[in-house]
């Protein structure tokens, strides 16, 4: 049975790329019975009715799956955050990073609109972002003048399935247009009254860009931690990993426990205090959710 990759899902149809051809497929009824939904990024077996139409028959095992946006088998996430308009937001960035780390997806940070900053603002931003670089996250800086030049990003996309995410109004669609001008992704100017943009993408699609595939998605519509356990959160902060074995108590949540290596590292500056503050905020949010349900 032929195999292929779902590169687009729209109105109940799944568009499967296979050996240079694009086959418009419907899902088998058995998927509904199993409460299974084929996703963009799925490797599938399909049965062709003719050269252009067919049915998805089976879904290959996924290495990961995001629900909002609905996509599978993602290698890396390009997280776009602006230096200004809207302002750089570390709490929101850390929310994104936790969700990405939870699914074993490699993050790449892009800080856009850096030319809109005054010198003092640029110094403050550089200090904040340096901490993410020290953790090991790759970081690229771009300006509004560089918006049409994706040359620095292209090598990072090779042989990867990438998803672009970030705060509304930071230039995600503009970045995709620079990467794939033929795609003509719809963009919206930021609303100065609201201080944010609007998501413009309506469906999920994988675009061939450079030597890789980049997902044009409707964006992350939910950043809540509904599917995460409190004890799993710590593994989504890479700077904790080498220290956790030094905590006195096995299973330490690095909150109220005594002789905690993470809290000691915050005191010495080895772990950044605002990252730890965000960790505690997320931890208490997860614990409160579990108590409610």
UniProtKB/Swiss-Prot annotation:
EC number(s) given by UniProt: 3.6.1.-
Amino-acid positions noted as binding GTP in the UniProt annotation, renumbered to this chain: 112-115, 166-174
Necessary cofactors: Zn(2+)
Pfam families: RsgA_GTPase (PF03193), RsgA_N (PF16745)
Cofactor note: Binds 1 zinc ion per subunit.
MF annotations from Gene Ontology: GTP binding; GTPase activity; metal ion binding; rRNA binding
Domain CP-type G, chain residue ranges per copy: 63-223
Keywords: Cytoplasm, GTP-binding, Hydrolase, Metal-binding, Nucleotide-binding, Ribosome biogenesis, RNA-binding, rRNA-binding, Zinc
Taxonomy, superkingdom: Bacteria
Location within or outside the cell: Cytoplasm
BP GO terms, sorted: ribosomal small subunit biogenesis
Keyword Metal-binding recorded: yes
Residues where Zn(2+) binds: 247, 252, 254, 260
A GO CC annotation given for this chain: cytoplasm
InterPro entries: G_CP_dom (IPR030378), NA-bd_OB-fold (IPR012340), P-loop_NTPase (IPR027417), Ribosome_biogen_GTPase_RsgA (IPR004881), RsgA_GTPase_dom (IPR010914), RsgA_N (IPR031944)
Keyword Metal-binding attributed: yes
UniProt similarity note: Belongs to the TRAFAC class YlqF/YawG GTPase family. RsgA subfamily.
HAMAP family given in the database record: GTPase_RsgA
Summary of the function given for this chain in its UniProt record: One of several proteins that assist in the late maturation steps of the functional core of the 30S ribosomal subunit. Helps release RbfA from mature subunits. May play a role in the assembly of ribosomal proteins into the subunit. Circularly permuted GTPase that catalyzes slow GTP hydrolysis, GTPase activity is stimulated by the 30S ribosomal subunit.
Subunit-level organization: Monomer. Associates with 30S ribosomal subunit, binds 16S rRNA.
Family annotation (NCBIfam families): ribosome small subunit-dependent GTPase A
Name listed for the protein in its UniProt record: Small ribosomal subunit biogenesis GTPase RsgA
Lineage, top ranks: Bacteria, Bacillati, Bacillota, Bacilli, Bacillales
